[in-house]
Amino acid sequence: MAVLEVKNLTKKFGKFTAVDNISFELKEGEILGLLGPNGPGKTTTIDILLGLTKPTTGEIKIFDLPFEENREKILKQMNFSAAYVNLPWRLKVWENLYTFGRLYEVEDYKEKIEILIKEFQLFDLRNKLTDSLSSGQLTRLYLCKAFVNNPRLLLLDEPTAFLDPDISDLVRKYILNKVKTEKTSVLFTSHNMAEVTEICDRVIFLNKGKIVAEDTPVGLTKRIKFCKVRLFFDLNLGKAELLLKNYKYNFSSVEKEILVDIEEEKVGQLLGRLSLAKLKYSQITIEKPTLEHFFLEVIRNKNEN
């Protein structure tokens, strides 16, 4: 079942189009990555879904209800976390969370919040003023707020920004557990492609306000046919470079190392040619494509067009 349906969504600011006729859906218990370069597309889309700005054209249905006509009912079952959230700075951590617990009409919100601040390692900071928190501590506070009402739909904009690796891992595991146990649906943005690959079921790429690719992280990675072969030569570096030039390989070299950009299926052919020429390498590493390579390729191609 689709929890979120977006059809032909467009948002213009004067002559500038921030979101350009995009359509997608998010299913129950699914994590959908919304990715793209820095720019207004992702944030504007999230702002529209939160009712913070109105679309120029397009339709949004959440929980099978038209969003505009059912905003209050829908928003009580949603929540979000983002680095640009502004909380009352002069309130203490627990005061901020209690405010949101009451706002969302959460039963037993005090007990719920105590569990959350322990989960996100904020318990010892509960009496600190919000404006005294570090960036990483604020991120954890935003996440506590996001989960306080057990939302059916969660919008997470860079949820692990400013977090140490161990806390980032804790956050990802918590999100995955929520999805598994409560069928929470998550729209997830991040610039950490390894994180996206780990956590997202599907990914949408936005560039200049348009959807330019949509697939699973693995499916998108498979679209990149090239890999990088790193070869180290103690001897005969010059002869190896000459062979690669003669066969018109795309490569670069520095000191004893040669880096070859090559189609993955042709790696065996390359190694065979080196062997026939009796050019022995002391070490080899093969860097297979990742989602980050796909991200860079998409942006490069679109910027050239």
Predicted segments — roles?
Residues G58-E69, K73-I74:
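Conserved ABC transporter NBD signature motif
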Residues Y98, R102, D108-L125:
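Conserved ABC ATPase "signature" region
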Residues L129-G136:
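Conserved ABC ATPase signature
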Residues N150:
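Conserved catalytic motifs of ABC-family nucleotide-binding domains
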Residues L154-E158:
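Catalytic Walker B motif of ABC-type/P-loop ATPase nucleotide-binding domains
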Residues K173-D261:
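ABC transporter nucleotide-binding domain
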